[in-house]
Amino acid sequence: MIKVAINGYGRIGRSILRALYESGKRDQIQIVAINELANPEAMLHLTQYDTTHGRFQSPASLDANVMTIGDDRIQLLHEADAEKLPWRSLDIDIVFEATGALIDRQACEAHIRAGAKQVLISHPSSGDVDATIVYGVNHQDLKAEHKVVSNASCTTNCLVPIIQVLDRAFKVRSGAITTIHSAMNDQQVIDAYHDDLRRTRAAGQSIIPVDTKLARGIERILPEMKDKFEAISVRVPTINVTAIDLSVTLDKRVDIDTVNQVLSQAANGSYQGVVGYTNAPLVSCDFNHDPRSSIVDGTQTRVSDGHLVKLLLWCDNEWGFANRMLDTSLEMIKAVRA
């Protein structure tokens, strides 16, 4: 059994907890504590009721600073300084760092000094972390000595398995990416101040370009893709699910059927549970609450001149990523205990 704590109980923190109880991994992972500055009543309420993912199916209640889920008692903490958290006395194996604020090694080492054995960051990180992991692609690279690990981003988890499949089958020369991402809580409900002038605008009224370092994130996982990709990102007025428009130039000559067959075989083979494939005429909301990292929409595959391939990928940017946090944490402990 792994003892974990969640630091930051926002969209990803709550999705991790819910995913644990829905995924069948509760017999392997125990959430001992949650640290969040919000009041306990709000934490319970947002656990029970979620606009995006619906009602929590497990019984949950609150007694002072303890949230009970079924037979589990989870301590609720409200500490702003990570170094003061009681991870040593709680014997925490892994902290899920989900605040979005502690995203580099130096910041996350506060959890280690507080007594946690390892930290898994729910955010892309700088190169000084011990490893950046995309489960299904490079989780086998985890080592016992890795203390601070990044789970990359939802879009990196969506793209990298597909790029790896295409490169192994056809050799990728270059690529361009457009991420069509649902609105996030760093945007405004109505026009308000923000350092990014585009993010001063109402999230529900515009398609909003935002900066992205996605191409560099791909290189971190697949070094052979260095300088081969560029990416742009736009936020759209939906509350969940992301589409990715991926264009790649391949060495080998292909057609639509060949590309789709390779991707379908990957989804049903070694990437099963991480990659999906569909030919159904679906829209974004049909992928809400989908635990996979990436779903290929085979109906939208296009090939130009035998070498330029365009794909449409879907992912639930909350739920899929939360499930990968759980998967990666299990691999971290497996490496420690090997």
From Swiss-Prot:
Principal place of residence: cytoplasm
UniProt KW keywords: Cytoplasm, NAD, Oxidoreductase, Pyridoxine biosynthesis
UniProt gene name: epd
Binding residues for NAD(+): R11, I12, N317
Gene3D superfamilies: Dihydrodipicolinate Reductase, domain 2, NAD(P)-binding Rossmann-like Domain
UniProt protein name: D-erythrose-4-phosphate dehydrogenase
Disulfide linkage: none
Residues at the catalytic site: C154
A Pfam short name: Gp_dh_N
Gene Ontology CC annotations of this record: cytoplasm
Known partners and oligomeric status: Homotetramer.
Chain residues that bind substrate: S153, C154, T155, R199, T212, K213, R235
UniProt GO BP: glucose metabolic process; pyridoxal phosphate biosynthetic process; pyridoxine biosynthetic process
Coiled coil stretches, renumbered: none
Catalytic activities: D-erythrose 4-phosphate + NAD(+) + H2O = 4-phospho-D-erythronate + NADH + 2 H(+)
Known function: Catalyzes the NAD-dependent conversion of D-erythrose 4-phosphate to 4-phosphoerythronate.
Subcellular compartments: Cytoplasm
EC number: 1.2.1.72
Family to which the UniProt record says this protein belongs: Belongs to the glyceraldehyde-3-phosphate dehydrogenase family. Epd subfamily.
Signal peptide coordinates: none
Site (Activates thiol group during catalysis): H181
UniProt superkingdom: Bacteria
UniProt organism field: Shewanella loihica (strain ATCC BAA-1088 / PV-4)
Keyword Cell membrane: no
GO molecular function, one term: NAD binding
CDD domains: GAPDH_C_E4PDH, GAPDH_N_E4PDH
Pathway note: Cofactor biosynthesis; pyridoxine 5'-phosphate biosynthesis; pyridoxine 5'-phosphate from D-erythrose 4-phosphate: step 1/5
NCBIfam families given in the database record: E4PD_g-proteo, GAPDH-I, PRK13535.1
